From Swiss-Prot:
The lineage of its organism: Eukaryota, Fungi, Dikarya, Ascomycota, Saccharomycotina. Belongs to the crooked-neck family. It comes from the Eukaryota. GO terms for cellular component: post-mRNA release spliceosomal complex; Prp19 complex; U2-type catalytic step 2 spliceosome. The keyword Repeat applies. This is Pre-mRNA-splicing factor SYF1. HAT repeats lie at residues 10-42, 46-78, 90-122, 126-160, 208-247, 408-442, 444-480, 500-531, 574-609, 612-653, 708-744, 746-782.
Length: 850
């Protein structure tokens, strides 16, 4: 570009003359040249030639100006990059020349070098020699402290070029890089590329230099303690080295290679690897098989496949070996079949093919058994695998092997370490015993099944619940064979024996003692006793059941379900008062309010069903809802009491006490109101209270509506609208119901007052309020006139304006937009500040703008 012939008339205009005069007067002033360039660049008519005309003269005058050269180079690069026309070689070389000129005096400017090298890589990737020479020249001129700026580009160039050039670049980087960086210990330090020695090895292999890669592998494997920071573990590096050797052997066709020595070296390498990584048996055996397949030594390949399957200890290794083994055999069979087709009938080859086919089929069929054996070698206490093994033999209908497997499992498993990795409920040690006994029971061999159960309950287990399961199944064995007496003897022997006082959860006590307090076993015992009763005349049997229930209560193992079952049993045999006493006993035993609520719920329903004295029932309802004589009971919690109040109210109504029914619902609202203000309720419980409160309002309103007492109905609606605890959606729903009620009565002034009230509750544009405005408009169209419609529109404009002012005020007071928490909806300040309208004799008595 320096050799261009300039057309002065085409490059200069009258506006340029002052700037030309300045640079002519003081050509060595950088500011003059920069002002001139910036002015010219800002004009719409400025072309690439205009810029170059100024910059070329500037850099000639100030050849050491880094700033001018950078501007010049950026202009040239931009022109080359944005030009849509074909770029000739001469144009590219002219850009090269600009860079070369700049670097003659600024050869220590890394940014110039980077721009130059990036340009060369992008536009002249085929000039390998030029690129390599310029990279080396750059590294030679720049101080070593700045080399880290160049190496990323140099490495990218090496990756693109590959081959021996790429190898030389990476080996050169190997000399430059910090040893700690190569070891993966200090890759975050400034100037490090994050390239480790294993990355370099990968590149050397990719570029075809196996010899250099092998040297680096050996160096790493001999000093694994120094390379702990690498992204690849020593195991990964070891396997990569093995793969490298396998691939190099398969490519080596020279007859001078001593394969026997190489085989010995390779097998020794694998054995050394097994010593270092004993948990990688499968993977290393697989490498051996691949090696001998490459060597076409199929006998040794099969030998190591079999050895691998016998010694591997992980599913991953087993799957890899087995899949590779089957693929290997399939390929052999395919090759033999193709060979047989070409040769025609060949008895020897045919026999060999049949033999190999049988071996292959056996290998496929044995897979689940081989895998199961491997899993049991890995963990003999894994119940899942023992159950799988039994299922395998069951599918084959091999009863003898099933029984042998049961016996082997129960003989081998440590009961205190038995577990199910899959967390399957059915895969338990008790079920192993039970299934074992059931094999004989299914063949009507009750004697052997009984013997197995008798041995099972003497074994150790991890929890008393396991032992209880065995006792239950043992009893079921005799129940199924119509020997209920023997079943009861077995369970009574354990449940009624004297054991003294102990804690069921005390792990220091033998489970054979703790099982006496197993509610699971007691529940079965109770069910068994109850099943023996057929009529009311069996007094002794009934008393025996009652006594058993009382023992569970005395042992303090009764659950809420036990109490309910006890009460149901007594009710079933017409012991009603004793049934009610059972419920009351449960209320005394259990302290949890939710449990008490459930018991009360059932108790009250039952006592209403039997139509006892009304005062007694009322007294029970009052005890349930409020503090009672029951120790530690302070009344039903507010978040649970709604069903009780509804049941109580419905009961009173069914007895003709309508006023009391309504009063009870009002009491419920009061209790919920007080409960919502208590701090000990959680947010979720308070949300429940609000929902229950709204539901009670709905029930209360529906009751009053049936009376056709308009004044009482209005009072309830007004009460609900004054309730500041209800949510906005609830208030809106109640208001709209109130509006419909007044509309049916043609109390239009009241309706308008209600519309005004509800429309003030939130922003007129909110999704909740906007439909209400539409309803109001519809109402005025149907029942109003032009004046009332205009009044509605004026009110709407006022509300919109007030809300806009309210928002502006809030934003000015709280510019960060923090929101203060609140409880329930609050009526807008509009309702407070709005002027009162004239008194309306038909208006509703609410705290709202009417």
């Amino acid at each position: 570009m320096s050799g261009s012939v300039w057309d002065i008339e085409g490059l200069l205009c009258e506006d340029d003359i002052p700037y030309e005069q300045e640079v002519a007067k003081n050509p060595n002033n950088l500011s003059n040249w920069l002002r001139y360039y910036r002015f010219k660049s800002s004009t719409s008519s400025c072309t690439f030639q205009n810029r170059v005309f100024i910059l070329e003269r500037a850099v000639k005058q100030l050849p050491r100006s880094y700033k001018l050269w950078m501007i010049y180079i950026d202009v040239v690069l931009q022109e080359v990059q944005t030009s849509v026309s074909y770029k000739s070689k001469s144009e590219i070389l002219s850009v090269n020349m600009v860079f070369e000129r700049s670097l003659q005096l600024l050869n220590r400017a890394p940014i110039l070098w980077i721009k130059y090298l990036e340009f060369l890589v992008e536009t002249q990737p085929y000039e390998i020699t030029l690129l390599r020479r310029k990279f080396n020249e750059c590294l030679y001129n720049l101080p070593i402290s700045q080399h880290h700026l160049i190496w990323p580009l140099y490495i990218r160039f090496a990756d693109d070029v590959g081959g021996m050039t790429g190898v030389k670049v990476y080996l050169k980087y190997l000399q430059y890089a910090n040893p700690e960086s190569l070891q993966g210990l200090n890759n975050e330090q400034e100037g490090e590329l994050g390239i480790t020695i294993d990355d370099i090895i990968s590149k050397l292999v990719e570029f075809g230099d196996v010899k250099e890669a092998s040297k680096l592998f050996q160096h790493i494997l001999q000093h694994t303690d120094k390379f702990i920071g690498l992204s690849k573990s020593p195991l990964q590096l070891w396997i990569e080295y093995i793969d490298l050797l396998v691939n190099s052997v398969s490519k080596n066709k020279r007859s001078t290679v001593n394969y026997n020595e190489f085989d010995y070296f390779f097998e020794k390498l694998i054995k050394d690897g097994l010593q270092k990584f004993p948990d990688q048996i499968g993977k290393f055996y697989l490498k051996l098989t691949f090696y001998f397949i490459k060597r076409k030594n199929l006998f040794k390949a099969r030998y190591y496949f079999d050895e691998g399957l016998k010694t591997c200890v992980s599913v991953k290794d087993f799957t890899m070996i087995f899949d590779s083994y089957t693929e290997f055999e399939e390929n052999i069979l395919t090759n033999m079949s193709e060979k047989l087709e070409k040769l025609g009938e060949d008895s020897d080859l045919n026999n060999e093919l049949d033999l190999r086919m049988n071996v292959f089929e056996k290998l496929i069929n044995d897979r689940p058994y081989l895998l199961n054996d491997m899993m049991l070698r890995q963990d003999v206490n894994n119940l899942d695998e023992w159950f799988k093994k039994i299922v395998l033999y069951k599918k084959d209908s091999d009863i003898n092997m099933m029984l042998d497997t049961y016996a082997a499992a129960l003989r081998t498993i440590n009961p205190l370490k038995a577990h199910s990795l899959a967390n399957k409920k059915e895969n338990t040690l008790p079920n192993l015993w039970i299934n074992y006994a059931n094999v004989y029971a299914s063949q009507n061999d009750v004697k052997t099944a009984n013997l197995i159960f008798s041995k099972s309950v003497k074994s150790q287990f991890q929890s008393p619940d396991d032992l209880a399961t065995l006792y239950i199944e043992w009893c079921e064995l005799f129940v199924k064979h119509n020997d209920d007496k023997k079943a009861i003897e077995i369970v009574e022997d354990i449940c009624t024996s004297e054991r003294g006082k102990f804690d069921y959860n005390d792990s220091s006590i033998d489970i054979h003692i703790r099982v006496q307090k197993s509610i699971k076993l007691w529940s079965f015992y109770l069910d068994l006793l109850e099943s023996m009763i057929e009529n009311n005349n069996q007094i002794d049997e009934i008393e025996k059941v009652i006594n058993a229930y009382n023992i569970t209560i005395d042992l303090k193992i009764a659950t809420p379900l036990t109490i309910i079952n006890f009460a149901n049993f007594l009710e079933e045999w017409n012991f009603y008062e004793r049934s009610f006493s059972a419920y009351e006993m449960g209320l005394k035993i259990f302290k949890d309010s939710k449990i008490k609520f459930e018991i009360w719920n059932i108790y009250l329903s039952k006592i209403i069903k039997h139509e006892l004295n009304i005062e007694r029932i009322r007294d029970l309802f009052e005890q349930c809802l409020n503090e009672s004589s029951i120790e530690g009971y302070n009344g039903c919690p507010a978040n649970l009491c709604k069903p009780v109040y509804l049941l109580y109210s419905q009961y009173e109504q069914s007895k003709g006490w309508f006023t009391k029914s309504v009063k009870i619902l009002q009491q419920g609202l009061s209790k919920l109101d007080d409960g919502y203000n208590q701090e000990f309720y959680t947010k979720a419980e308070k949300d429940t209270i609000l929902r229950d409160k709204f539901d009670i309002y709905q029930v209360l309103i529906s009751k009053i509506l049936k009376l056709n007492d308009h004044n009482e109905t209005r009072k309830i609606y007004e009460q609900s609208l004054k309730d500041n605890q209800l949510t906005l959606p609830n208030l809106i729903q109640l208001t709209m119901e109130f509006i419909n009620f007044e509309t049916e009565l043609m109390e239009f002034n009241r309706v308008r007052s209600l519309f005004k009230y509800v429309c003030q509750l939130s922003n007129p544009q909110s999704p909740l309020i906007e439909p209400i405005w539409h309803n109001w408009e519809t109402f005025e169209l149907n029942h109003g006139n032009e004046a009332t419609f205009k009044d509605m529109l004026r009110f709407k404009r006022k509300i919109v304006t007030e809300f806009e002012k309210d928002i502006i005020l809030k934003n000015s007071l709280n510019p960060m937009g923090f929101v203060k928490s609140s409880q329930g909806p609050k009526v807008s300040s509009i309702a407070i500040s709005a002027p009162k309208e004239e008194n309306n004799p038909d208006s509703i008595d609410l705290d709202m703008d009417m």
